[in-house]
UniProtKB/Swiss-Prot annotation:
SMART domains: EF1_GNE
InterPro entries: eEF-1beta-like_sf, EF1B_bsu/dsu_GNE, Transl_elong_EF1B/ribsomal_bS6, Transl_elong_EF1B_B_arc
Xref: SUPFAM superfamilies: eEF-1beta-like (SSF54984)
Single GO MF annotation: translation elongation factor activity
Keywords on record: Elongation factor, Protein biosynthesis
Function: Promotes the exchange of GDP for GTP in EF-1-alpha/GDP, thus allowing the regeneration of EF-1-alpha/GTP that could then be used to form the ternary complex EF-1-alpha/GTP/AAtRNA.
Gene name as annotated: ef1b
Organism: Methanothrix thermoacetophila (strain DSM 6194 / JCM 14653 / NBRC 101360 / PT) (Methanosaeta thermophila)
Protein name: Elongation factor 1-beta
Length: 89
């Protein structure tokens, strides 16, 4: 078994959301079963930006992203959470 890396796209509710404060909120929302590896802001369209988070999970624990997705979706200012990629590293 190994480590699972998941790239997760977090979409803010609007273009008015401060991306730096959203990044801090996402960092604090990472569950104990996961480790935040990287985070970046990606422009989408018309001034809207997405937060891309790479999270590492233990494959022995199932490697599922549901707990992380649920935690991220509860953060204030988050419109949606979508897993873009999952793979073993």
């Amino acid at each position: 078994m190994g480590t699972v890396a998941a790239k997760i796209r977090v979409m803010p509710e609007s273009t008015d959301i401060d991306m730096e404060s959203l990044k801090e909120s996402i960092k604090s929302a990472v569950p104990a079963s996961a480790k935040l590896h990287a985070m970046d802001v990606r422009p989408i369209a018309f001034g809207l930006k997405a937060l891309i988070a790479v999270v590492l999970l233990d494959d022995k624990a199932g490697g599922g992203t549901e707990e992380v997705e649920e935690a991220f979706s509860k953060v204030k200012g988050v419109e949606s959470v979508e897993v873009e990629e999952v793979g073993l590293i």
